[in-house]
Swiss-Prot record:
Its biological purpose: The beta subunit is responsible for the synthesis of L-tryptophan from indole and L-serine.
NCBIfam families: trpB
Annotated Gene Ontology cellular component terms: cytoplasm
Pathway: Amino-acid biosynthesis; L-tryptophan biosynthesis; L-tryptophan from chorismate: step 5/5
Gene name of the record: trpB
Family indicated by similarity: Belongs to the TrpB family.
Protein name from the UniProt record: Tryptophan synthase beta chain
Species in which this protein is naturally found: Methylorubrum populi (strain ATCC BAA-705 / NCIMB 13946 / BJ001)
Xref: CDD domains: Trp-synth_B
EC numbers for this chain: 4.2.1.20
Enzyme's top EC category: lyase
An annotated Gene Ontology molecular function: tryptophan synthase activity
Signal peptide (UniProt feature, chain positions): none
InterPro entries the record matches: Trp_synth_b_CS, Trp_synth_beta, Trp_synth_beta/beta-like, TrpB-like_PALP, TrpB-like_PALP_sf
């Protein structure tokens, strides 16, 4: 990794071409270009319209349940201090995005995109989903606003996330199992892009993470930034100062970007992103694009990708369906190269330990995705002084993972 000179601000991207340094952009078929430009224009207009912001805030409060609490994880903090050297052991806070309606951070972004789709007069919404959380959030808001909803989901994920598949169908969505490729998130996204090209007139593609062609990475980040904005306000109210560090898990990276972005220019705040190391980065069975990948183009943007020797996209593996994406949002790739954010990775085994510990100590069953972040909190917190304030984004609840984790632990439900 080469450290480039630090810019005056880490928050000015992307440029007018949708780039963060050499990352991002819009590498799409000619047929999609008019749609992308329309979307960019509509988003710029919505951002400048006070009524759009008012709608976001109103539905955020009364439908999603914002603000989400910033919660002091007291027993976890004490547990880690007990085995840390004297005077060590950070004070740990959870940003509780799992308490949102639909059970994760995904709904923040979907609300913004669905309100935008309505402004653009698009009655049909398509989405891709891995763990099913983005699919559920999209189906939920389509039901709320009476829009047709089609969700593409890899056939493997359909099997391991059965509760969410049923939820989507209950909400009136059509769930399309994708049988091509690895039959996971990457393939679901490919199918959704194909659908969009075919149905340009009436369809809005609601992307679930900070990936895809510009303006999606910036737009999704903006809609998720409510997480970091609230965290700043809440921490100032609780502790009278900013946190010392932030930790979040990363698949495509929208929950992390939402927490990180408002803090990027607060240079004293350490920022950690946690990718999925699967069976270990050396094993080849992982989803850690920054740790084990290299720059390339996928799904309309240039970013770090998992590739084989021939430059073909490699299979990603993670215990968590929401993290097994072979790429990462382009802004994360840029922040990695600039050295502003430190990217770590957590194995399946470490994640399961954190999943158990959080459940037992805090009475919160986390999703497997934020359990990756928690596993690194367990490592980082004991190395920090006791006055260090650490915030982890608890981006989703674990209900969807209970059948899978029960099976791993040898329990039959």
């Amino acid at each position: 990794m080469t450290l480039n000179p630090a810019p005056n601000s880490f928050r000015t991207g992307p440029d007018e071409r949708g780039r963060f340094g050499i990352f991002g952009g819009r590498f799409v078929a000619e047929t999609l270009m008019p749609l992308i430009l329309d979307l960019e224009k509509a988003y710029a207009e919505a951002k400048a319209d006070p009524s759009f912001k008012a709608d976001m805030e109103s539905y955020g409060t009364h439908y999603i349940g914002r603000p989400s609490p910033l919660y002091y994880a007291e027993r976890l903090t004490e547990h880690l201090r007990a085995s840390a050297p004297a005077g060590q052991g950070a004070k740990i806070y959870f940003k509780r995005e799992e308490l949102n309606h639909t059970g994760s951070h995904k709904v923040n972004n979907v609300l913004g995109q669905i309100l935008l789709a309505r402004r653009m007069g698009k009655p049909r919404i398509i989405a891709e989903t891995g763990a099913g959380q983005h699919g559920v959030a999209t189906a939920t808001l389509c039901a709320r606003f009476g829009l047709k909803c089609v969700v593409y989901m890899g056939a493997v994920d359909v099997e391991r996330q059965a509760p969410n598949v049923f939820r989507m169908k209950m909400l009136g969505a059509e769930v399309v199992p994708v049988q091509s490729g690895t039959r996971t998130l990457k393939d679901a996204m490919n199918e959704a892009l194909r659908d969009w090209v075919t149905n340009v007139a009436d369809t809005f593609y609601c992307i679930g993470t900070v990936a895809g062609p510009h303006p999606y990475p910036a737009m999704v980040r903006d809609f998720q930034s409510v997480i970091g904005i609230e965290t700043k306000q809440q921490m100032l109210a609780l502790e009278g100062r900013l946190p010392d560090s932030l930790v979040a898990c990363i698949g495509g990276g929208s929950n992390a970007m939402g927490l990180f972005h408002p803090f990027l220019d607060d240079r004293e705040v350490e920022i950690y992103g946690v990718e999925a190391a699967g069976h270990g980065v050396q094993s080849g069975l992982h989803a850690a694009s920054l740790t084990g990948g290299r720059p390339g183009v996928l799904h309309g943007n240039r970013t770090y990708l998992l590739m084989n020797e021939d430059g073909q996209i490699a299979d990603a593996h993670s215990i968590s369906a929401g993290l097994d994406y072979p790429g990462i949002g382009p802004e994360h790739a840029w922040l990695h190269e600039m050295g502003r954010v430190t990217y770590l990775s957590a194995t399946d085994t470490e994640t399961l330990e954190a999943f158990k510990l959080c459940s037992m100590l805090e009475g919160i069953i986390p999703a497997l995705e934020p359990a990756h972040a928690l596993s690194k909190v367990l490592e980082l917190a004991p190395t920090k002084p006791a006055e260090h304030l650490m915030v982890m984004n608890l981006s989703g609840r674990g209900d969807k993972d209970i059948p899978q984790v029960a099976q791993i632990f040898g329990q039959t439900l």
